[in-house]
Amino acid sequence: MENKIVASTKEEFNTWYKQFAEKHKLNNKYTESASFCAEIPQLDTYKYKMELASTDNERDAIYSSALIEATRFCAPIMECAWASCTGTVKRGLEWFDKNKDSDTVKVWDANYQKLRTETPPAEALLAYQKAALNWRKDVGFSIGEYTSILKKAVAAEYKVPGTVINNIKEMLSDMIRRRNRIINGGSDDAPKRGPVGREHLDWCREFASGKFLNAFNPPWGEINKAGKSGYPLLATGLAKLVELEGKDVMDKAKASIAQLEGWVKENKDQVDQDKAEDLLKGVRESYKTALALAKLSNAFRAQGAQIDTVFSSYYWPWKAGVTPVTFPSVSQFLFELGKNPKGQKKMQKALINTPLKWGKRLIELFADNDFTENRIYMHPCVLTSGRMSELGISFGAVPVTSPDDAAQGSGHTKAVLNYKTKTEVGNPCACIISSLFEIQKAGYDIESMDIVASEHLLHQSLVGKRSPFQNAYLIKGNATNINII
């Protein structure tokens, strides 16, 4: 087996792709990037089958079949082929050899076994994101809009057809419920963080930007005053700023607090020491609380947006010992996986039965039965049977040993993001996601699930991802605040 997508540079790849696209008459009628999609798949049959299913195995098989039907022909072929061409494979795998001992990789790679079972520390999440951005830059992965690092703010509106608007709004409401449940300590009945007012937010922004003396006279009175939720108002304001403006807010706030401490020390003759110490203690505690709230909120807001699909997809094979020589066998396995639905057990059996060592090594990376926390917290470097779909879209939509076979179709979940969101063509992305949600509702208790796969896809569409190969870590704003119209 050998990789037939031979291209070391963007120019060489463009030559290969132009011939391939013309030969297969790829189109972008319903998809952002050109694909084999000629029509929008209808999934009603799977909903009816789900209503009649009596076992979890049946339900899992039906949903897997629906996913493959929904995504079989909609993969972004150009980006999939670029992710799998000889040059990208060589550079993508070699990067981990060169950087495995760097600060941005070692903190999570060396602790992989721990991350399979435990909630990751914040530094392991941040290091992963920095590593993903570095990988993209060093490998030269970006060749256009659909392989880019997104930096814009979340849109204010998301337009959908009237036929699915109720479903999409229901999904968004459930996402908000889950976010609140996480933020409020796992209880739907716990006090909720209310909306943060503009005056409150503006004051916290000024405080974080260096106006530390504002701490003596906040608009709500005492600096350490708590809101209805029980959290200090300074903490909720800073946490909200992190949602809106990014994690740099906390670094700025930390510096402002240090300046405040220095000022109090230098002017000790001018302040009441007991009151000053109480104020400083409260500000420090508010900072710690804001960090915790921001982490909890981000865990929901970024459950998938912060999984860099192609970066993790290169990490797992590298970890399993895959080389450019054995890579074609991985691509072929994933292509077949996307043609025939397999549940968790059948997939693992197929990996175990492969004569190639990487199959068993991938199984050893799985965390399906080991992670006991809410799966929304699982580190994006950890592999599960569900995350095999990340590998699938990266390397399985276009089998490198026979790229022409891509015309047969191979369905992988994240390909949904390639469907257009434009209302001129009926927002097929939202329509497919809505259908998948209806299928899940027909067979599962949605409220009891840690992660609802269809909601996860909607979340990524709402934050602006129009391709599985985009990185959304730097996007500002909260997708759950978007207005569905």
From Swiss-Prot:
Locations listed in the record: Virion
Cofactor list: Mn(2+)
Provide a GO CC annotation, any one: helical viral capsid
Primary location class:
virion
Quote the cofactor binding remark. Answer: Endonuclease activity is stimulated by divalent cations such as Mn2+, Co2+, and Mg2+.
For this protein, the Enzyme Commission number is 3.1.-.-
Q: According to the UniProt entry, where does the motif DQVD sit in this chain?
A: 269-272
Q: Which domain of life is it from?
A: Viruses
PTM comment text: Cleaved at the DQVD motif by host CASP3/caspase 3 in mammalian cells at 48 hours postinfection giving rise to cleavage products of about 30 kDa and 22 kDa that remain associated. Only the monomeric form is cleaved. Little or no cleavage in tick cells. Caspase cleavage reduces the viral polymerase activity. Caspase cleavage is not required for productive infection in mammalian or tick host cells.
How is this protein organized at the quaternary level?
Answer: Probable homooligomer; forms a double superhelical polymer. Monomer.
Q: What does this protein do?
A: Binds dsRNA and ssRNA and probably participates in the packaging of viral genome. In the dsRNA binding mode, the nucleocapsid protein specifically binds to the vRNA panhandle secondary structure formed at the termini of viral genome. Does not discriminate between viral and nonviral RNAs through ssRNA binding mode. Displays dsDNA endonuclease activity that is sequence non-specific.
Name this polypeptide is given: Nucleoprotein
- This protein's species is Hazara virus (isolate JC280)
Q: Which gene encodes it?
A: N
